[in-house]
Amino acid sequence: GPAILAGNHTSHIDPIVKIMGARRPVHYLAKAEHFDDATMSKLMTSTGQIETERDIGAAGALARAVDVLGSGGLMGIFPEGTRSRRSDPPFLARGKTGVARLAARFPDVPVVPMAILGARSVIAPGNPVVNPFARVEVIIDEPISFGDWLADPKGGDLNDQNVENLLSLDEHGQRSIMRAYYRGFTDQLIETLRRLGAP
């Protein structure tokens, strides 16, 4: 069934690592520049990557991810939103809430935290030298759906009273509350990746 694979992003090989670990196609939103080179374009297309123009914005990217999950596919996502640009650890940055917004569209779909360790040893940003012998490790934690996280007292803690309060608000108030939930889910996901050892 569908799932969201969420991991840290320190190297160009991170998507490949997730694809190999999943043993079934994993789709990613990839910037259009990755499709400019014919060889790279063929690789991206053959592995199910989705070409995304920067100017379509977050809503357009989310719509494409929704299509993947709606058809029962695996959607890979990097909660940080981009590859880490830091030259020294810690590389893990604050997450963007796109992962939570996507998970909220499919509240029963599992979000699988995947910490990728050692990817920078294979190929580091700005370094064209590839070390094919470097060890890369993927540590996977228990999946959690957005719906389960919302109901969990250690997560969103959305009980019956909170639901009533949420429904009593106008649209602006509801959006404000949901933004807080998205931020909370994302922050806990990033903290899970850190706990798993993501550098």
Residue ranges and their predicted role:
Residues 1-57:
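Catalytic core of membrane glycerolipid acyltransferases/transacylases, capturing the structured
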